[in-house]
UniProtKB/Swiss-Prot annotation:
Pfam (any one): Urease_gamma
Species the sequence originates in: Pseudomonas fluorescens (strain ATCC BAA-477 / NRRL B-23932 / Pf-5)
Keyword Cell membrane recorded: no
CDD domains per record: Urease_gamma
Stated name of the protein: Urease subunit gamma
InterPro entries: Urease_gamma (IPR012010), Urease_gamma/gamma-beta_su (IPR002026), Urease_gamma_sf (IPR036463), Urease_subunit (IPR050069)
GO cellular component: cytoplasm
Main localization (coarse): cytoplasm
Quaternary structure and partners: Heterotrimer of UreA (gamma), UreB (beta) and UreC (alpha) subunits. Three heterotrimers associate to form the active enzyme.
Amino acid sequence: MDLTPREKDKLLIFTAGLVAERRLARGLKLNYPETMAYISAALLEGARDGQTVAELMHYGTTLLSREQVMEGIPEMIPDIQVEATFPDGTKLVTVHQPIA
């Protein structure tokens, strides 16, 4: 299977997102890489499902709460930016204050 570097990056984000999802389901608090992967993967999947940039910007703020991540993580992530592929091309999705 020949994948472009961009496809490899998306696959890595998706895989790390699955690990984070499983840990969250077990009641574990997510660390920084897990938090980034969880939110990024959800945004990429949302774009694939046809959501708009504006919808994803809001959706990204609803995925995790302070109680679901380790102490200090919300302050480490003032925003998340993900390049997602939409039906009309690639766009940058920015989520400000993703963890409320």
